[in-house]
Amino acid sequence: MKNYIIGFLVFLFAGILVGCGDDNEKEIEESSEQKVEITEAEKVDETDIVAVVNGDDIKGETYNLVYSQLKLHAGAFEEEVDNNEIKQATMESLIDRQLLLQQAKEEGIEITEEVVNSEFETIKSENKEALETLLEQYQITENGFKDQLKFELTLNEFLAKTIEVTVTDEEVEEQYEKAKEGNDSIPEFEEIKDQLKKQLLQQKTDEALQAKIDKVKEKSEIEEKI
């Protein structure tokens, strides 16, 4: 199930849409053809509290949003999707997300509604069709998308403020040698070294972020309600 999760959110939608070109639009269109059913029995009442994290409630509305994202994304990679795994992954994602938001608040990071609305309008004006397809595919409203967008903007600021990672040339070369094993068609090192470096930076950032959240989680009060 971990393979389905990008960081602790499922998708950072704005990251998909910002700078969206023909290739990305095609990917969104193709993925929208995936037929994954989400029944009413899988959803919870939007007003129900699904978890409490250090006194902060997580509501059913957010649970349903993340659950649907996870299941639809999983369905693109697996012929059969285990709903219990999706539920577990959803709860883990929501709890990690809430812990991060709490940590961001302690760091003085606050994304205003004005910033969110401005960013949303930019995305909407530049990628209207892709946005509409994405909202339909993941069964979310514009307000739901804005919630995700606010989280992404918060996450970006939190990463910039609290996490610093580096990747050496030696690490990039080592990664290339690993990738080259058994793969004769891999491009020359100079052609993909920048891409490999970005991948390693992202991997290290994800690991550092998860370690930070896991440390906070150890001393947190968490109650799952479902």
Regions found by a protein language model. Give the residues of each.
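Charged, solvent-exposed alpha-helical segments that act as regulatory interaction surfaces
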Residues: 76, 129, 164-168, 185, ...
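Surface-exposed patches in mature extracellular/periplasmic domains of secreted proteins
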Residues: 106-108, 113, 185-188, 211, ...
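N-terminal targeting/tethering segments
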Residues: 36-140, 145, 207
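Charged/polar, low-hydrophobicity segments characteristic of intrinsically disordered regions
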Residues: 130-138, 184-198
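Short, low-structural-confidence N-terminal segments
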Residues: 1-82, 178-181, 191-226
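Phenylalanine-focused residue identity feature
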Residues: 8-13, 77, 120, 145, ...
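Solvent-exposed aromatic/hydrophobic patches embedded in short alpha-helical segments
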Residues: 71, 85-104, 115, 140-141, ...
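Short, mixed-charge aromatic SLiMs
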Residues: 115-129, 174-188, 221
